[in-house]
Amino acid sequence: MIVGYLLLNFLVAVVRASSVAELVGTWTTKSRTVVTGPDFYDPIDDKLLEPSLTGISYSFTADGYYEQAYYRAVSNPTTPSCPKGIMLWQHGKYAVMPDGSIQLTPIAVDGRQLVSDPCSKEVAMYTRYNQTEAFSSFTVSIDSYHHVKRLDLKAFDETPMPPMYLIFKPPQMLPTTTLNPVSSETGKSKRHIARDIGSPVGVDTLMRSDHIGDPGRWLWFGIFMTAMGGIALIYS
């Protein structure tokens, strides 16, 4: 019985190790324009950089670090020709659980969100963003059409995420340490974060989406992420 127990634990460890190995790299949706790393977020100037098309990207390292980049068009029911834009960036640590789920825990002070409504405002709201995330399962396979590695994630509620394709291995990421430390004296970041900025998100870009998923579903996704994101508005 003891031998059987040890063998079971060994097999579980092997499965988890191979699962982590399969995740390693940078994955992006089919537009291939949204990619984690310095092309999406500039930590020196503290700004998000607009890609030419919308999309999603995740990067994973073998030692448990991750980074994510989102650029989504959110449908506007009153003015369909004028969608809103949401850009998100986070990084932190992840863990693959024994049941195959993935738990992502971001560095709370580093996450950023940019919300833009180019048809109604000439400015966009740039805020700190902190949202833990969980995927119920993941699958890595060779895509039958593109003939490259493909990552399929399912959200915590089993909703399939848009498929992503391996674009870099090793992953393209920013440093995995805290990029925007908080001052212990004031409790504020060295650079205040809540501010209106000139909107970098254009209507043409938002209309040229990569057509991954139903816009109506992404509307509710955007509302959920904005409402539940633990956004901190830190004023100087």
UniProtKB/Swiss-Prot annotation:
Cellular-component GO terms for this entry: endoplasmic reticulum membrane
Lipid bilayer topology: Single-pass type I membrane protein
Glycosylation sites: 130
Keyword Glycosyltransferase assigned: no
Gene Ontology biological process: 'de novo' protein folding
Pfam families attached to this UniProt entry: Rot1 (PF10681)
Family the UniProt entry places it in: Belongs to the ROT1 family.
The protein's name in its UniProt record: Protein rot1
Organism: Neosartorya fischeri (strain ATCC 1020 / DSM 3700 / CBS 544.65 / FGSC A1164 / JCM 1740 / NRRL 181 / WB 181)
Gene name in the database record: rot1
